[in-house]
Amino acid sequence: MTRRISDKSKQILHMGEGKGKDYVPYILTSEFNSLGTTSIITDWKTGRNIHCMSQGEAMWYFLLRWDDSNIDIREQFPLDNKITVKIADELGIKHPQDRNHIMTTDFLVTKSDNSLHAYSVKVDKNLNNQI
């Protein structure tokens, strides 16, 4: 059985904060009810546990990790709620869950030039063609 941690508790616990070995993902595999396979992978560079919610995420993580230009990989990274609500409003679409729910991206990667790249890993059959 999954145990969901409230967004308020996650903020108190500083989940979704930190960098490198000190990063704690915003969503843990123990609180996620997946139709697929969740994985906890030990990162061989930082020693930190990486929480992947699907086989696709695990495969993408390995591709990211083998690229030496990726200096930090943070999974289940929380997005700024004010920005996601604004984007939904501008596009005329309903913000997922309630408007106070924190959304995440599957991976936020810091490159060696300090640029940030966000990745969402989805199976193509789960994509919605209406947007």
PLM features: what roles do these ranges have?
Residues 1-131:
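Electrostatic, structured charged patches in enzyme active sites and in nucleic-acid/phosphate-binding
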